[in-house]
Structures are given as structure tokens and as C-alpha cells.
């Protein structure tokens, strides 16, 4: 049998039972319109994928279950993944200032961890939303521009379909927990659900627009 079913936390998870993979795609086949896909990675069960309601997700993330959101479809909140490879307790001030420059009036929910070796943050914006692939590529180019010109702790490679983003109060096996830093509302930290009906338009300055057009021309050259 290619897959193994594990029932946990009111979710039926699918786990690879062979080296052929495919558990994530199998979970997507069972995804209902009112559910979101999730991924769990623990020492006990390894990697497994499933689907749950946003309401149940809030209960699940109260304790560490190694849970991740799988960013599988649109819409979802604009998010940033920040990784600085040293301890810097003041880094968040700089990062938030940069985000506010590109996303005026951004309402942020911040989680993360700080160790002697690394400073990490996930930042979800409550009032900026990605509705389609073009907007996702725009956010990617903004993050890339920031990384290359202003602050290299911005990870611009996290804007892909089926990207796994660690949820609050969760951790990889034997790693620091993704702790709430700003905004105590669990809903605010979820990227793929609890999305506001109203959002601000994604602003694009001239420099970013040039980068977007260059990237599009590269893709057009590949297609032709």
C-alpha cells in the first residue's frame, strides 16, 4: 500500500508508506471547499498531510503538533519569512520599518524565534491579500528587491505553490517553537484562512515594476 492513514486531532492524515511519495497530492484530492490543507512533521509520525476546517485548526495550534499551513490556493494573506543567521533582538524593528515602506499601514502579526545562531520571523499582513499568481509574483519581486538592495534576511524564495509555512506554537522536531511575538489573535497568524473581506491594493513602485517586467520577459523567452 502506497499510503498509510493516521487519525489524529480530528483529522485523517495521509502518510507515505513507500519511497514513491505522493501523500500531499493524495490529501489535495480529498480537500473540501471549506477546508485548508495542513502538514505535520513530528518525531513520532514523521511527515503527513491532511485537511481541516479553520475552526479546528485554531484548536490544533494551541499545542505543538509540528503543524504547517500548505499554501495551496488563493486568496491568502501577504506574508514574509525573515531569517538572519545571528542573534539580533532589534532586527524586528528594522524589518517592520522596511515592510511599512512598501506596504503602507500594514497590519502585522509576527511570530518567530531567536537563538544564539539565528533570528527568525514569520510576518502575516492582515490588510494585504494575494488573490492570484500575478500578485504572488509581484510580492516575490518586492521581497527579492528588498533582499538584494536593503536587507538580505528577507527570503524571496518562499512564494511558491504548496509552500509549507510553520504555524504558531509549532516547531520542527527538536527545534525552537514558532512563538507569538506581536498580535495575540491566533486567527491573525494564519495565512490561508481568516482573511479579511477588505484589503488594500498591492502598491508597486517604478523599481519593482522594472524587475517584474524583466522577470516576465525571461519567462517569455523560455516559452518561445
Which residues does each predicted region cover?
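DNA replication initiation on ssDNA origins
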Residues: 1-97, 154, 158-178, 189-193, ...
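Short secondary-structure junctions
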Residues: 38, 105-110, 179
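Short small/polar-residue motifs
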Residues: 64-66, 103-109, 153
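Histidine-centered divalent-metal-coordination microenvironment in nucleic-acid enzymes
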Residues: 75-80, 106-135, 162-168
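Helical (often loop-to-helix) elements that flank the catalytic cores of nucleotide-handling enzymes
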Residues: 87-102, 119-154, 173-193
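N-terminal structured subdomain of primase-like DNA metabolism proteins
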Residues: 215-224
